[in-house]
Amino acid sequence: MEVPTESKTTQIDEISHNLSFTTSNAGDSSWDKISFFRHRSRQIKRDTWLVSVFVLLQIVLFAVTMGVNDCSGNSHGHCSAKLLGRFSFQSLSENPMLGPSASTLEHMGGLSWKALTENHEIWRILTSPWLHSGLFHLFINLGSLIFVGIYMEQQFGPLRIAVIYFLSGIMGSLFAVLFVRNIPSISSGAAFFGLIGAMLSALAKNWNLYNSKISALAIIFTIFTVNFLIGFLPFIDNFANIGGFISGFLLGFVLLFKPQLRQMPPSHKGKLFEDDMNRSTRLKEQFDRPVLRIICLLVFCGILAGVLLAACWGVNLNRHCHWCRYVDCVPTKKWSCSDMTTSCEVYSSKP
């Protein structure tokens, strides 16, 4: 049977178009790479309810903490921002972050050596990640959480981000317990540092799928550095931040194994698009081999078990590392990092 001339012409045109497209794009696979920090309009449309709940919850808890602190009533007017009344802050010499007193932080569930070892209040490991030392700490921490958390939730979904956030907070608190002193400290940065670690592992794991990698590394490093420097101030535990970062980095290799691929422009769709998508999928699967996930999971479980046993045995690494206290708090003329828990002032009037 003779093939119509028009059909032959159509087939020849399609073959010529495919050959032309293949030649013009030979050796160029930039179309299947994606920017790590993509514009919001190009990201997957997902609700970010999880990060919103985290932010709202921590704002409410900070307001409750300041209400319980009641500086105007307990410190006899030695407060900052006195116009706020009950919600005014302790003096800057006591808390440079514009927040409550040390005794209030301990009362609300902050970490302290006496509470953990003598009173066996292990529940503080769960409450400490939700507290903030002051208004400055709250703004910087939640601002960073919104930037990092929304991106991570949009890319990988709320369930995996919630697991990383909670486990990193617990791991960070356990790290902090090994270095905790009598002055109370909070570990809210641990959960956030877990997201930073997970973001870094997601970038490293899918390195060949992203462009602008140096810019992404610079952004991650900047966020890490700013939040880590804040940890040198009183009541913020940098060891918790370190523990949370390690936890998030390992859990990122375990859980974040599905990066989003950018689709080709409509004019590039067809069999060639399917072939290149298969190539990208094979590349992704090369990074997603279960051996790496299993190794990272075993390392995470080993570290978690180790710090948990050390915390239960009451190990205090400050006895073996005298300079470690400066990783957690650097004393200056403006504030002190002593082991003495600061309480609200109490004055007695003489007759």
From Swiss-Prot:
The chain crosses the membrane at residues 48-68, 130-150, 160-180, 183-203, 216-236, 239-259, 294-314. It is a multi-pass membrane protein. Gene3D superfamilies: Rhomboid-like. GO terms for molecular function: serine-type endopeptidase activity. It is found in: Golgi apparatus membrane. Keywords: Golgi apparatus, Membrane, Transmembrane, Transmembrane helix. The keyword Lipid metabolism does not apply. Probable inactive rhomboid-type serine protease. Probably essential for the meiosis stage-specific callose accumulation and pollen exine formation. This is Inactive RHOMBOID-like protein 8. The gene is KOM.
